[in-house]
Amino acid sequence: MRILKSHPLLKIVNSYMIDSPQPANISYLWNFGSLLALCLGIQIVTGVTLAMHYTPSVLEAFNSVEHIMRDVNNGWLVRYLHANTASAFFFLVYLHIGRGLYYGSYKSPRTLTWAIGTVILIVMMATAFLGYVLPYGQMSLWGATVITNLMSAIPWIGQDIVEFIWGGFSVNNATLNRFFALHFLLPFVLAALALMHLIAMHDTVGSGNPLGISGNYDRLPFAPYFIFKDLVTIFIFFIVLSIFVFFMPNALGDSENYVMANPMQTPPAIVPEWYLLPFYAILRSIPNKLLGVIAMFSAILALMVMPITDLSKLRGVQFRPLSKVAFYIFVANFLVLMQIGAKHVETPFIELGQISTVLYLAHFLVIVPVVSLIENSLVELATKK
């Protein structure tokens, strides 16, 4: 054991994964960190393996994916693992963010950790979008066309930026090549950001806890207690992932992407992967192109303002009934946006999308500060009696 505390590299591992003192009362909602690290690891390993057999060319991309599926030993397994772990990654990230919002993990002194986490989310979305283009099916081509075209909303220089991204006048071979290069690069950037996220948390006050108070009253070492606790959820994760990979590998995908990309034929509905749907719904709900793009980016960056807009004296909403109601309305609204993003742009969905978009942004900018001020006042009234 002594080498763990003296060796320059091993002592870092020791301080993060063995001796790290964690609050004794953290629940299973604090297990997402290890699960997300596992997801990133799986994605990098399967991604590099796929890259060994993939050809980033508009003529060969679709066929090279079919070659991976049919001819490469266990290629189908590697590809389905990659595709379904991507979904698992986002599902767990949304739960992780939800945990952070519920328990006030964004409040000082964890503001930096929260900010880095938001950057991680943005990089994840960029990586996922780039990866979705690579199989070069119908949804890949048209999804790439629609999303890259968003840049044309920027006044004056927009169209030039779009053509710069494309490397031509439409999505072409140059586009596919650069998307492949970036999709290969960004997961490593993501790994670096995840380390920064960990360091920012570790070097301030460590994990929070369900009570929202100091964790210093009762702590336990990370090993063996929390190693074992993390392993419980890791095994559950593998079981659920296996069910998807082996029994319904295409349940979360789009059948349209099994049709080779055809620039002459637009699919009936251009829909991104399920995990980007809420933001796609926000983008589509505003008729003005530029304002839609601004709203979509604002919806992601709104997480950054939580440390400023939450004016409550208490950390988290677990002991704040009004905030708890607001939080659950926000979650329900997010799920509604996810449904609307998959629908056609027609009458009931347009209006519903606009209401949901307003409610989503209002939660961060209006509802949270107003409700927290009301609760502060009620607490003061109750304590003065």
Curated annotation (Swiss-Prot):
Annotated positions binding heme b b566: 96, 197
SUPFAM superfamilies: a domain/subunit of cytochrome bc1 complex (Ubiquinol-cytochrome c reductase), Transmembrane di-heme cytochromes
Residues that hold a ubiquinone according to the record: 202
Compartment(s) where it occurs, according to its Swiss-Prot or TrEMBL record: Mitochondrion inner membrane
Transmembrane segments annotated in the record for this chain: 32-52, 76-98, 113-133, 179-199, 226-246, 290-310, 322-342, 349-369
Protein topology in the membrane: Multi-pass membrane protein
Molecular function GO terms recorded: metal ion binding; ubiquinol-cytochrome-c reductase activity
Gene Ontology process terms (BP): mitochondrial electron transport, ubiquinol to cytochrome c
UniProt-annotated binding residues for heme b b562: 82, 183
Gene Ontology CC: mitochondrial inner membrane; respiratory chain complex III
Alphabetical UniProt keywords: Electron transport, Heme, Iron, Membrane, Metal-binding, Mitochondrion, Mitochondrion inner membrane, Respiratory chain, Transmembrane, Transmembrane helix, Transport, Ubiquinone
CDD domains xref list: cytochrome_b_C (cd00290), Cytochrome_b_N (cd00284)
Cofactor(s) demanded: heme b
Cofactor binding summary note: Binds 2 heme b groups non-covalently.
Family statement: Belongs to the cytochrome b family.
Its biological purpose: Component of the ubiquinol-cytochrome c reductase complex (complex III or cytochrome b-c1 complex) that is part of the mitochondrial respiratory chain. The b-c1 complex mediates electron transfer from ubiquinol to cytochrome c. Contributes to the generation of a proton gradient across the mitochondrial membrane that is then used for ATP synthesis.
Subunit structure: Fungal cytochrome b-c1 complex contains 10 subunits; 3 respiratory subunits, 2 core proteins and 5 low-molecular weight proteins. Cytochrome b-c1 complex is a homodimer.
Miscellaneous comment as given in the Swiss-Prot or TrEMBL entry: Heme 1 (or BL or b562) is low-potential and absorbs at about 562 nm, and heme 2 (or BH or b566) is high-potential and absorbs at about 566 nm.
Protein's name according to its UniProt entry: Cytochrome b
Organism: Aspergillus niger
Recorded name of the encoding gene: cob
